[in-house]
Structures are given as C-alpha cells and as structure tokens.
C-alpha cells in the first residue's frame, strides 16, 4: 500500500524504523568495542562534522560509520528424527535427521518379494551430509555508511547517503542457507523538512556472492557420487545381498521355507 514508499515493498514482513544521528546535531567521534563468548568481537567507529558559511550558518555536514563483527555461530547439530518421521534412531537402515540433509530420500524393501531377497532390510535412507560438514559457522559482517547533508534553508535538508554491507553467516528461511560473501549496496537521495514532508529516491542492489542452500547442496553432492536410482536400487541392495543377507540367514530360527514371507 501507500506505506511502501516509506517502509519499502516488503513491509508486511515486519518493520524496524531506525533514525540515524544527524551530523548537524551530533558531530564528533564515537568508538565502540565489544567482546563476548564464542570469539565474538564487535568494533565500530562514527565520525561526523559540520561546516558553516560566512554568515555563521551551518550549511554542510557529513558523517561516516564503520562497523565490523565476527563470531563463531552455534552449530546446528540436532540429530533427532524430524517431526512425523516413520523411523527412529533404532532403525539400522537410517532415519531422516533434523540437521542432516539428503537423508530425506527413503527406500523400502517391505514387499513380499523383497523380503525374500533382502530379509530384514525394511526402510533404508541415503546417508546425507550433516550441516556442520557443508557450512561455515564463522560469521563475519562488515558495514559502511556515509552521508552528506546540505541545508537549503535552516529547516530544509538535501541528503545523499551510501551504504554497503558484506558478510558470511547462516540464515534460517524455508531452508538453511549459507550466506557467503554476500554484498549489499544502497544509494539514497532525499529532500526533507522535519515533521512536514520528505521526497526520497533510493536503489538497493545485492550480490549473493558464493551463497548456497545447504539442503539442496547436500542433495546435489550425494547425487554426484551416485544417483538416487543407482544408489537405492542397485548399489545399496547389492551390498546388502552380498555382505548382510548371508549373516541374516545364519541367525538362529531364520525360516528356510516360503510361508514366512506371508
């Protein structure tokens, strides 16, 4: 709706309204340093200054902001079965774990004919990849922001600003995403009079860098080694028949006649 001009087209996802310090009102230097657990380090610096004309009126001001953050993110290592899974950790043929990707692919040998050739096989899953093996938990974030303010009148300002962001981290959306070397650029020009009006034009550009979907990547990686059809219908079953079935048939009480398949 009309608020898109003010908050942006994705405002329905939620809005955080941030008003940055005006260099005419808040000049000077500010420095920030934080440390914390998980090797967290955050540092930042702001420098702002204003200039007056011959009449002693403030006409031009600028500000520059820099911030950098690094930390080791928590690893997603939940190996419990996903909600609604038909198999548990006790299923020797595997199960679909929360933070293991690619193991969503499931096969079964539960038909009567397959019970004869592959006794005890039941449901079995592709091995997949654990998230910790395919993503980088070393989060990094760099932000730069600059602005030039010009007072056309004492209460009317023309502002140009440029913002840049770069980083690597893990993002939770519909899937798990590894945001790697992602970049954001924003240019904005604005004419405003405090508490009366503003006219704003801006452009935001982004470059996903080397980012990727962790779940899709895991599936593609295991398909490179062996397709789902090749792995489930041939390789795994052949291995089971050659190395597991002989031992199963030697178990005490293993039936040797056909009626057991019913």
Q: Where are each of the predicted segments found?
A:
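Outer-membrane beta-barrel translocator/receptor signature
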Residues: 5-87, 139-142
């Amino acid at each position: 709706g009309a608020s898109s001009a003010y908050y942006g087209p994705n405002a329905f996802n939620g809005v955080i309204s941030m008003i940055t310090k005006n260099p005419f009102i808040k000049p000077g230097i500010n420095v920030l340093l934080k440390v914390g657990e998980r090797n967290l380090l955050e540092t930042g610096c702001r420098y702002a200054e204003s200039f007056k004309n011959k009449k002693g009126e403030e006409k031009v001001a600028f500000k520059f902001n820099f911030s950098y953050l690094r930390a080791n993110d928590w690893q997603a290592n939940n190996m419990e079965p996903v909600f609604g899974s038909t198999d548990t950790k006790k299923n020797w043929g595997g199960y679909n774990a929360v933070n293991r990707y690619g193991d969503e692919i499931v096969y079964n040998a539960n038909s009567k004919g397959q019970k004869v050739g592959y006794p005890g096989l039941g449901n079995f899953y592709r091995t997949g990849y654990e998230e910790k093996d395919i993503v980088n938990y070393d989060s990094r974030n760099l932000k730069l922001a600059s602005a030039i303010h010009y007072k056309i009148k004492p209460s009317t300002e023309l502002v140009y600003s440029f913002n840049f962001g770069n980083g690597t981290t893990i993002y939770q959306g519909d899937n798990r995403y590894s945001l790697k070397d992602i970049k954001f650029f924003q240019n904005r020009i604005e004419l405003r009079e405090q508490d009366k009006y503003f006219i704003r034009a801006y452009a935001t550009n982004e470059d996903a860098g080397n980012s990727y979907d962790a779940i899709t990547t895991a599936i593609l990686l295991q398909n490179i080694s062996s397709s789902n059809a090749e792995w489930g219908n041939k390789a795994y079953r052949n291995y089971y028949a050659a190395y597991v079935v002989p031992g199963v048939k030697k178990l005490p009480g293993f039936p040797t006649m056909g009626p057991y398949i019913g």
